[in-house]
Regions:
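PRPP-dependent phosphoribosyltransferase catalytic core
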Residues: 1-14, 163-214
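Active-site-facing substrate-recognition patch
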Residues: 1-71
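Short glycine-rich phosphate-binding loop at a beta-alpha junction
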Residues: 69-80
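Structural motif
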Residues: 73-74, 147-149, 184
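Short, well-ordered alpha-helical microsegments
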Residues: 82-86, 193-194
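Short Gly/Thr/Asp-enriched flexible loops that form oxyanion-binding sites at enzyme active sites
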Residues: 84-93, 164-165
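Short, glycine/charge-rich flexible loops or terminal/linker lids adjacent to PRPP-binding catalytic cores
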Residues: 96-148
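Acidic, divalent-metal-coordinating active-site segment for phosphoryl/phosphodiester hydrolysis
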Residues: 152-164
Length: 214
């Protein structure tokens, strides 16, 4: 039985991931792209607690295999689609806190009195946007002595990952230290072929079809 059942209508793509008890039927969606429409398979994990838990266990095992010693390593993710997944991975690995890049500077960050960082980014599902770190995440990243692990839901063009790397480089420059090494990018799925040279190896559980421009 499909994990998501019949929660979403329309044509579906069946994603099978080794280790999951059942396949996931994901909807095809069309999003604006340069005056046309881009047809993609939508993997939206927001709100799916059980699926995030199960995928988190699988990704945690992949991380343990690739990086057996996680001491001095800080986990980083971007809101909002990958946040629950990253929290599930961290819980499985016994990681107490993860650094989060937000999609804009928010009021609680108190940017007029606390340190913040912001860079631009672009992704298939979110389009052009900003990514921002505030004091708590900055200090957590500065505590890393052996690099950073990025957790994401889907790696497509790589725009979000390049923006995360820009944040790490800006953070290092501002604090007069060498840039933090991105040790690996761990995701549920890769979508098509990356359009950019990514800053770290990508470890995925599955693959999604190439987006189609209509």
């Amino acid at each position: 039985m499909d994990i998501l059942g019949a929660l979403e209508s329309g044509e579906k793509y069946r994603l099978e991931i080794p280790g999951l008890p059942s396949p996931i039927d994901l909807p095809y969606v069309e999003i604006p792209e340069g005056g046309k429409r881009l047809r993609i398979v939508s993997l939206n994990l927001v709100g799916l607690t059980g699926l995030n838990r199960d995928l988190g266990k699988l990704l945690a095992a992949r991380i343990r295999s690739a990086i057996p010693d996680l001491s001095g390593v800080v986990f980083l993710t971007a809101v909002e689609k990958a946040l629950m997944l990253c929290q599930a991975v961290a819980a499985e690995l016994g990681i107490e806190a993860v650094a989060v890049a937000y999609n804009r500077v928010k009021p609680h960050m108190q940017a007029d009195r606390r340190p913040t960082l912001q860079v631009g980014s672009s992704s298939v599902t979110s389009g052009s946007k900003f990514l921002a770190l505030y004091e708590r995440d900055i200090n957590l990243l500065l505590s890393a002595t052996r690099g950073v692990v990025v957790v994401d839901d889907v790696v497509s063009t790589g725009g979000t990952l390049l923006a995360l790397n820009d944040l790490l480089e800006e953070l290092a420059e501002r604090h007069g230290r060498d840039p933090l090494q991105m040790r690996g990018i761990f995701c549920v799925a890769r979508e098509g072929d990356p359009q950019a040279l990514l800053p770290a190896p990508v470890f995925s559980l599955a693959s999604l079809p190439q987006p189609v421009l209509l």
